[in-house]
């Protein structure tokens, strides 16, 4: 059987991604080792029954269950096996989603797959695994595909595109409501842009996608309105940061709280210069990084600094978009607009797509260029107050903490533009059709992806879990002084393996980062009663099943009928 070219590109993309992801998480793929992830569990029950019981409790109390929970909840494989795999798989889906989108826009396989690789390992996008922000990674498993589905649904109007558009947008909402809201607004604007570009509004398909969206996302929307907003109000009322607690009135307190973690303008240089102000503030990552020689450095910038404070910061991620990514994005903008505005005699780039396709390409590049600029300005937060006040005044805008989150959208837009830059290089008049040119551009993309992965690698600090798994214990990480080990109780715990030293704490020879093991208590919690959330969860599961079956039938049915007719 002849292998199609598109399948070869897919396999190539997968192979390169697997190699780079293996490099990023190198040293933690063993079941006995996991990366530091402060906001995610790295210690799990060994029994599958406990994983299933935990997932059932979650469903009965919140109604939440989506396809990726099979991986994230450890329902089929050991949760220790899935610890790094679930993050890597989400990054893979994000890269594949951008490649899917750009292929639909007519870009070549190299441009599409290259942009996907750059997105998958983009600094802020990928390095948040070190913080354990699993909800963000669950969103990217589905959310990026919504752009390609929006484009195809408007252009082609096929049933499966509308069903998947509603489903993917809903699935992405379950565990990271704030970032989901930002990207859903961007997706919605792009959907409207597609309608303008194609000069039509398919209202029937839109209604179908909306019905699927609300049916599947019902438990998530209920949780956001009932729990998340109330929780954020309690955070603000308690004045959880020093600067917010000292505010003059409630309005100022809310503004300070929401705009903490604004991106300092001077740190925008890190978009193209990696590690300009160090790497991370996480003491566990720094301590273990020094122990294993990863080269990670303390963060010395101002991100996370309280308002008007002379010092202080906190971040657990990179801001590096990539020099190659930014360069290709600028090339994409320049080539498209130069090609559109120059006379045929002066054109240096031949896209060879016809005037209508060229017009649509300009639409897309314009959209992502403007979106990148706006999202960057929004990420500045209180450092660009007149602009961010516009976001703050929108519905739910005063609930969206940490304006630096807008940098995720900036990264996405720049990677999409980078795809157009790759395409522009491939279509230079003196490179087009030459294998050497293809190899040169491909090498540039691979260098850019490796450069990003090399930076992400610094945030992977391995934690030894052998003793935890051998005894099926719970574990907490703590800091002990040298003299604490002279305590008879601590000495006895060290002797029987209940206290395991991991590294010197922040390089201090008198402080130690340790694991403290405690016996795992049997899970005797009764199952929560059936609730309204569980009924909404049943509706969500039914909607998901209908979408999956319908799409499978639409994809496989014609082929089966063709095979039977032979």
For the regions a language model picked out, list residue spans one by one:
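Start-transfer (signal-anchor) and selected internal transmembrane alpha helices
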Residues: 1-26, 205-212, 327-330, 334, ...
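Transmembrane signal-anchor helices characteristic of membrane glycosylation enzymes that use polyprenol
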Residues: 9-44, 212-226, 374-377, 447-452
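Membrane-interface coil-to-helix junctions
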Residues: 17-95, 117-140, 249-321, 381-397, ...
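Membrane-embedded helix bundles of polyisoprenyl
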Residues: 17-20, 92-105, 109-195, 205-223, ...
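Membrane-helix boundary/interfacial segments in multi-pass membrane proteins
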Residues: 42-44, 125-137, 306-319, 374-414, ...
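Transmembrane alpha-helices and membrane-interface helical segments
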Residues: 96-100, 144-152, 187-195, 325-339, ...
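Perimembrane helix-loop-helix junctions
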Residues: 183-214, 224, 235, 333-354, ...
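Transmembrane helical bundles and short interhelical boundary loops of multi-pass, membrane-embedded
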Residues: 221-227, 231-235, 428, 432-566
